[in-house]
Amino acid sequence: MPVEKDLKTAYKALYDEKEPLKALHLYDEILKGSPTNLTALIFKAACLEKLYFGFSDWHSDATMENAKELLDKALMTAEGRGDRSKIGLVNFRYFVHFFNIKDYELAQSYFKKAKNLGYVDDTLPLWEDRLETKLNKKNKKQKDSTNKHTIKPVESIENRGDNNSSHSPISPLKIETAPQESPKFKIDWYQSSTSVTISLFTVNLPESKEQVNIYISPNDRRTLSISYQVPKSGSEFQYNAKLSHEVDPKAVSLKIFPKKLEITLSKIDSTQWKKLEEDILTESSRLSDEGKNSDSATRLLSAETASKERLSYPSSSKKKIDWSKLDIDEEADEEAGSADSFFQKLYAGADPDTKRAMMKSFIESNGTALSTDWEDVSKGTVKTSPPEGMEPKHW
């Protein structure tokens, strides 16, 4: 059927080619001829969500409102047909929608509805674990905030039991104000079999791509330097690193999001990187005032400090996969412009083969490998690949 072929083409554009705008136009064409096509309604909403979080021109309330309206129409259509599986799918997409805009309580209600309707997906355990983590963080913050604003009653002078007729003068209450922290510079990264993507989270962003200088040494193909002038202060932002493996100096792409830079590098080979950097040369934003000669040592982060900021490789525990280790802290989530950009890039909306490849490779390798290539993974058991200098133990 022509419509089925068009749906496959649009789905491929959205998830395989990573072109949500192209997919949006394709779904629009399908809906012109079939306004109640459930699949087109659901995934047109997904296109709008990806455009909202990935492109500044689409980052508006209207975009997300349109996505929600499409899901509303899809739900009405599915309920009208009595299609239980499609109703479950729409509820799952509602969950993703509200999760991404950080309404975790509402997201949880739709997640439960989807499960109760029998919706099945390989990523459900991962989403459930992620949702639980977010809710726990939110509840903890609310509890801490409540405790912080609790005022203890002051005991009156009459009730102190002090019989002295004279009292020492009462000193003015000194209120110590906690120093405000300077904006943090954080790093996140993930990889596929062909590329490595680095996210630099900072509030000091350039005005355009043209202002960013990205240099990869053609000699060792591992020395990376990223710099640009900060518009507001006139100071310079710099990130320098010695990558753990070689990349193509000529194949570099850059995207600027509301609170981060995203740099994608092409691998020379398909080696799975165990870490981003071999050693740390300089990892600092160098946001000192003009004319101020600060000690160069203050602009260097030690390997120990930087390692705390970077993300750990997923745990190999067979009982539970702690996917929260793949994420930076809550503040970085806020800066990313999405509820969970890193998790979203890896799992949200992946095609069925990619999902199967990721689940199979991670579980069979005991958490030491993560592949998106189903054609490769399906050929046999994925072997355990421990980090360099370590060996697997069989208990």
UniProtKB/Swiss-Prot annotation:
Q: Could you tell me which PROSITE patterns the record lists for this protein? A: CS, SGS
UniProt keyword annotation of Cell cycle present? yes
By its UniProt entry, which Pfam families does this protein fall under? CS, SGS
**Which keywords does UniProt give here?**
Cell cycle, Isopeptide bond, Phosphoprotein, Ubl conjugation, Ubl conjugation pathway
What is known to happen upon mutating residue 99 to L? In sgt1-3; induces arrest of cell division in G2/M
Q: Which domain of life is it from?
A: Eukaryota
Locate the CS domain: which residues? 182-277
Phosphoserine occurs at: 168, 171
Q: What is the effect of changing residue 364 to K?
A: In sgt1-5; induces arrest of cell division in G2/M
Result when mutating residue 31 to P:
In sgt1-3; induces arrest of cell division in G2/M
Cross-referenced InterPro entries: CS_dom, HSP20-like_chaperone, SGS_dom, Sgt1-like, TPR-like_helical_dom_sf
Q: Which GO terms describe its cellular component?
A: cytosol; endoplasmic reticulum; ubiquitin ligase complex
Q: Where is the SGS domain?
A: 312-395
| More about this protein | Present with 1340 molecules/cell in log phase SD medium.
What family is reported? Answer: Belongs to the SGT1 family.
Q: What role does this protein play?
A: Involved in ubiquitination and subsequent proteasomal degradation of target proteins. Required for both entry into S phase and kinetochore function. Also involved in cyclic AMP (cAMP) pathway, possibly by participating in the assembly or the conformational activation of specific multiprotein complexes.
This protein's name:
Protein SGT1
Q: Which gene underlies this protein?
A: SGT1
